[in-house]
Amino acid sequence: VRALTEENGIVLIFDEVMCGFRVAYGGAQSIFGVTPDLTTMGKIVGGGFPLGAFGGKKEIMANILPAGKVFQAGTLSGNPVATAAGIATLTQLKENPPYEYLESLTDKLELGLIAAAEKHQIACQTNRVGSMLTLFFTGGPVVDWSSARRCDTHRFAEYFWGLMDQGID
């Protein structure tokens, strides 16, 4: 994707709202070894408080005021409490990275889910990046929208609501 966007003069944007600081300190881009032109982040950058951020290559960011002509503002811009919480969270993640431990727990969860499904003869697949894990009720790999659409969504709903009923949310 990176090569394709560069060849065609297209800005590559990564939405790290889900993966940023969750799968690795450098987000999904550090795992996959792809540097986008712009990155967006969500509330993790605010330590769980409402805050959003974006950043990118110097030549793009130079277009943002005060240096450039593009005005950017928002409800979640620069809240001091969220910013302080974000700095504390990011400092903690950098100084005491939890990623290896989280992945080891996810390994156990994934193996347990697969074993339980096999025991009850339920077809399922797991997709995973770092500690982010998704369970699909299907017999084949889920690699795109078409394969995801073929999953047993009714079984997933039963699974989901069963977890909720047990207080697992």
Describe each model-derived feature in a short phrase.
Residues 1-169:
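Conserved N-terminal phosphate-binding loop of PLP-dependent enzymes in the Aspartate aminotransferase
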